[in-house]
Curated annotation (Swiss-Prot):
<dbReference type="GO" id="GO:0006260">
    <property type="term" value="P:DNA replication"/>
</dbReference>
<feature type="binding site">
    <location>
        <position position="165"/>
    </location>
    <ligand>
        <name>Zn(2+) 2</name>
    </ligand>
</feature>
<dbReference type="GO" id="GO:0051085">
    <property type="term" value="P:chaperone cofactor-dependent protein refolding"/>
</dbReference>
<feature type="zinc finger region" description="CR-type">
    <location>
        <begin position="136"/>
        <end position="213"/>
    </location>
</feature>
<comment type="similarity">
    <text>Belongs to the DnaJ family.</text>
</comment>
<dbReference type="Pfam" id="PF00684">
    <property type="entry name" value="DnaJ_CXXCXGXG"/>
</dbReference>
<comment type="function">
    <text>Participates actively in the response to hyperosmotic and heat shock by preventing the aggregation of stress-denatured proteins and by disaggregating proteins, also in an autonomous, DnaK-independent fashion. Unfolded proteins bind initially to DnaJ; upon interaction with the DnaJ-bound protein, DnaK hydrolyzes its bound ATP, resulting in the formation of a stable complex. GrpE releases ADP from DnaK; ATP binding to DnaK triggers the release of the substrate protein, thus completing the reaction cycle.</text>
</comment>
<feature type="binding site">
    <location>
        <position position="190"/>
    </location>
    <ligand>
        <name>Zn(2+) 2</name>
    </ligand>
</feature>
<keyword id="KW-0235">DNA replication</keyword>
<feature type="repeat" description="CXXCXGXG motif">
    <location>
        <begin position="149"/>
        <end position="156"/>
    </location>
</feature>
<feature type="binding site">
    <location>
        <position position="201"/>
    </location>
    <ligand>
        <name>Zn(2+) 1</name>
    </ligand>
</feature>
<dbReference type="GO" id="GO:0008270">
    <property type="term" value="F:zinc ion binding"/>
</dbReference>
<keyword id="KW-0963">Cytoplasm</keyword>
<feature type="repeat" description="CXXCXGXG motif">
    <location>
        <begin position="165"/>
        <end position="172"/>
    </location>
</feature>
<feature type="binding site">
    <location>
        <position position="149"/>
    </location>
    <ligand>
        <name>Zn(2+) 1</name>
    </ligand>
</feature>
<feature type="repeat" description="CXXCXGXG motif">
    <location>
        <begin position="201"/>
        <end position="208"/>
    </location>
</feature>
<feature type="binding site">
    <location>
        <position position="152"/>
    </location>
    <ligand>
        <name>Zn(2+) 1</name>
    </ligand>
</feature>
Length: 385
């Protein structure tokens, strides 16, 4: 993985929120997009970097690992940089940009399922604790959903009487010209229905729906992650015939105080005192399912990672279980008392020249510098003769 900083690529700070990250991504993606920079290899490479940066910083778990452990942590979690999506996938991420510039019918719009005044599919949010998401649970869902107004039968018009929209002639779309091109837009008067009410329904105030409520229990699968959605068929809004769409539960998972999640992998930072690093030690560390024994060999490096296979989180769609990764953080005493200082000095003296490794390096460097100066001084003297 190349050594460039994701925040610098998007020209943002490390404290930037998601909205700022998204705006920066759109700006930089448009700037370096291949369609705007044909045959420009540098722009193409920068475009890949922009997407790689956004792929990490827009994902809470990846961003948390990147901020805490750097790219090495991401590599150990299986992230290998730009995912290699083709540019049609990228256009999907940038759809809202093109829609605002060219209108909703440029190929990125979504159609309202059901053809009525409201969408039959509905989305609700559900917050889970870290433990609930990792091990699964059951949750009571309180759902408010739309049903067609009993007075106007879902039309929003008094007595259900609708007239053909005068602005679009019943087509639901109006057309506009930009230069030599013509674009279609949803009719702002009838909102794409092709019909409009001369007088609003007094019961639903023209909305075409009433609100009904229900409660039911949902089984949350083991391993579900933040940002995942659960589809519940037949629990969405109802059309005028009583047929219901689907309910999508958007899952939000709280962060844990000790564990950091990235997909099916889990990270924990293990503080180890410097003397234990020098001597080596064995520790009991907390894991998702109890304790693990961590053997730390002498002279382990700071931020070195120890991987426990099959101790992570179960994949929500398979039997695969991720890794549990323990990362070492070497700690030092903030200050020494007189006795500790004397012991430390005595220990350093006992190592002799080994305790001053810089001397050999510097002496070799000094020798090279002196030789270089002597050589050039001699050449200068020969030149002046």
């Amino acid at each position: 993985m190349e050594t460039f900083d994701y925040y610098e690529i998007l020209e943002i700070t490390r404290t930037s929120d998601k909205e700022t990250i998204k705006k920066a991504y759109r700006k930089m993606a448009l700037k370096y997009h291949p369609d705007r920079n044909p045959d420009d290899k540098d722009a193409e490479e920068q475009f890949k970097r922009v997407n790689e940066a956004y792929e990490v910083l827009s994902d809470d778990s990846k961003r948390q690992i990147y901020d805490k452990y750097g790219k090495e942590g991401l590599q150990n979690s299986g992230f290998s940089g730009f995912s290699g999506r083709d540019f049609s996938d990228i256009f999907g991420d940038l759809g809202s940009i093109f829609e605002s510039a060219f209108g909703a019918n440029f190929g990125f719009s979504t159609q309202k399922r059901g053809g009525g005044k409201y969408n039959l599919d509905e989305i609700v949010g559900l917050e889970l604790s870290f433990t609930e998401a990792v091990f699964g649970c059951k949750k009571e869902i309180h759902n408010s959903f739309k049903i067609a107004c009993s007075d106007c039968k879902g039309t929003g018009a008094k007595g259900g009487k609708l007239n053909t929209c005068k602005d679009c002639g019943g087509k639901g779309q109006v057309y506009m010209r930009q230069g030599f091109m013509t674009f279609a837009q949803t009719c702002p008067t009838c909102k794409g229905e092709g019909q409009s009410a001369s007088e609003k329904c007094s019961k639903c105030k023209g909305s075409g729906f009433e609100i009904s409520e229900e409660s039911f229990e949902v089984s949350i699968p083991e391993g579900i992650d933040d940002g995942n959605r659960i589809r519940i068929g037949g629990r969405g809004n109802a059309d005028k015939n009583g047929s219901r769409g689907d309910l999508y539960i958007a899952v939000s998972v709280a962060e844990d105080e000790n564990f950091v999640r990235d997909g099916e992998n889990v990270y924990i930072e293990v503080p180890v005192f410097f003397t234990s690093i020098v001597l080596g030690t064995t520790l009991k560390i907390p894991s998702l399912r109890g304790e693990l024994e961590l053997k730390i060999p002498p002279n382990t490096r700071d931020k070195e990672q120890f991987v426990f296979d099959n101790e992570g989180i179960k994949d929500v769609n398979s039997a695969y279980r991720g890794k549990f990764v323990a990362q070492i953080k070497i700690t030092y005493p903030p200050k020494l008392n007189a006795e500790q200082r004397a012991l430390t000095e005595k220990l350093q003296e006992s190592f002799g020249i080994e305790s001053e490794p810089y001397k050999n390096v510097f002496e070799e460097c000094f020798t090279k510098v002196k030789q270089w100066l002597h050589k050039h001084s001699k050449n200068d003297k020969d030149t002046t003769k």
